[in-house]
């Protein structure tokens, strides 16, 4: 039984989407509601991560200084050096402690991501691998039914079921042999029967040969004919029920990519990518990641990171619904970072901040050409 991302998607994410769609029939609002619910549920974990990052950003200079002193002091005694370093980590905290909340969040966030990349928001792909043998070897082929892993498909609003692609005679064919790829539920109900029960749903499967185009022929109904020996891969796609539905300024929740092959620009997707980059930059500023400590190279890296990360969506496009989720999630995290950055620091951390501020003021008061120690008075 699957208790991973698929379990979370089917038993947590999709029921939430179905509930909100039943209240307000808008898949766009359902995405917004689902994103906010998951983000609020993960708030304590992400808050712990943000607090730890804020703390480590403050204590890191002092911690590094102490570590360097220990390495120099006990360079001839590795055991004592290790012991003292562990004491420093106990005093200031382990820098890796903030990774645990992130690791705990990852399965939930990946399940949310996977949910928005599947039905009903996007087309679901099935990969059928075939082996074609010469016709004289047909006696060696043992018929054995072939089925792809089942995937969740929305047949109608609020109604979804597991659907698999099958080849009753198996995926090993002889040249000249004909067969048909069929979709059906786990209970064996044919996909056309499901569609007949919901005539309002226009879900016409599509077929594409991704490997071995010269070895096989396939029509719109999934009928195939083996032409030449070799390996073949056919990709079947069941369209997403809500893929062509819009929300606010978004034309289609399932649209993938900011630019079509005919060079048509989709400004709704471009706008979300730009806004995501801006929110990422603001989040970096609030979390202090843009404080490079006077290192110009690191400062440059921090500034261009949001540009690079956002620009990736132009080359590795995602469905508009997934982009909307990422924008909402990032804005939520930015607001959370802002709120937590206004929290009072623990007393011991506040003392470190005050000490650092005093040192900074003292360094500013000392001019570069002045000696750090007072000059001895000369007697004439």
Curated annotation (Swiss-Prot):
InterPro entries: YidC/ALB3/OXA1/COX18 (IPR001708), YidC/Oxa/ALB_C (IPR028055), YidC_ALB_C (IPR047196). The chain crosses the membrane at residues 12-32, 96-116, 265-285, 308-328. GO terms for biological process: protein insertion into membrane; protein transport. Required for the insertion and/or proper folding and/or complex formation of integral membrane proteins into the membrane. Involved in integration of membrane proteins that insert both dependently and independently of the Sec translocase complex, as well as at least some lipoproteins. Aids folding of multispanning membrane proteins. Probably also aids protein insertion, folding and/or assembly of membrane complexes destined for the thylakoid. Pfam families: 60KD_IMP. Its main location: membrane. It is found in: Cell inner membrane. It comes from Nostoc sp. (strain PCC 7120 / SAG 25.82 / UTEX 2576). This is Membrane protein insertase YidC. One of its GO terms (molecular function) is membrane insertase activity. Keywords: Cell inner membrane, Cell membrane, Chaperone, Membrane, Protein transport, Transmembrane, Transmembrane helix, Transport. NCBIfam families: PRK02654.1, yidC_oxa1_cterm. Interacts with the Sec translocase complex via SecD. Specifically interacts with transmembrane segments of nascent integral membrane proteins during membrane integration. Belongs to the OXA1/ALB3/YidC family. Type 1 subfamily. One of its GO terms (cellular component) is plasma membrane. The keyword Transferase does not apply. It comes from the Bacteria. CDD domains: 5TM_YidC_Alb3. Residues 361-380 are annotated as: Disordered. It is a multi-pass membrane protein.
């Amino acid at each position: 039984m699957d208790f991973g991302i698929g379990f979370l998607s089917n038993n947590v994410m999709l029921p939430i989407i179905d509930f909100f769609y039943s209240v307000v029939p808008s898949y766009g609002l359902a995405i917004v509601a689902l994103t906010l619910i998951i983000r609020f549920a993960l708030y304590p974990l992400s808050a712990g991560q943000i607090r730890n990052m804020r703390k480590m950003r403050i204590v890191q200079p002092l911690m590094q200084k102490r570590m360097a002193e220990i390495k120099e002091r006990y360079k001839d005694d590795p055991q004592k050096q290790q012991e003292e370093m562990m004491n420093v980590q106990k005093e200031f905290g382990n820098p890796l402690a903030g990774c645990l909340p992130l690791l705990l969040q990852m399965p939930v966030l990946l399940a949310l991501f996977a949910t928005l990349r599947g039905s009903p928001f996007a087309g679901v792909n099935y990969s059928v691998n075939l082996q074609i043998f010469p016709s004289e070897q047909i006696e060696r082929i043992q018929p054995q039914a072939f089925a792809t892993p089942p995937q969740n498909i929305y047949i109608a609003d609020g109604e979804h079921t597991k659907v698999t692609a099958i080849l009753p005679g198996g995926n090993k064919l002889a040249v000249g042999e004909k067969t048909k790829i069929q979709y059906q539920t786990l209970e064996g109900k044919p996909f056309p029967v499901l569609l007949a029960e919901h005539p309002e749903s226009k879900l016409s499967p599509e077929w594409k040969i991704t490997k071995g185009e010269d070895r096989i022929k396939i029509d719109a109904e999934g009928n195939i004919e083996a032409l030449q020996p070799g390996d073949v891969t056919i990709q079947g796609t069941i369209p997403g029920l809500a893929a062509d539905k819009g929300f606010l300024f978004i034309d289609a929740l399932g649209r993938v990519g900011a630019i079509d092959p005919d060079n048509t620009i989709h400004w709704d997707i471009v706008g979300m990518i730009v806004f995501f980059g801006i929110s990422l930059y603001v989040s970096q500023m609030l979390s202090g990641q843009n404080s490079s400590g006077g290192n110009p190279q690191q400062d440059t890296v921090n500034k261009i990171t949001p540009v690079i990360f956002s620009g990736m969506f132009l080359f590795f496009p995602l469905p508009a619904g997934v982009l909307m989720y990422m924008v909402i999630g990032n804005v939520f995290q930015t607001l959370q970072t802002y709120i937590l950055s206004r929290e009072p620091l623990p007393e011991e951390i506040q003392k470190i901040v005050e000490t650092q501020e005093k040192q900074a003021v003292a360094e500013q008061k000392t001019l570069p050409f002045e000696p750090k120690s007072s000059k001895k008075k000369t007697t004439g």
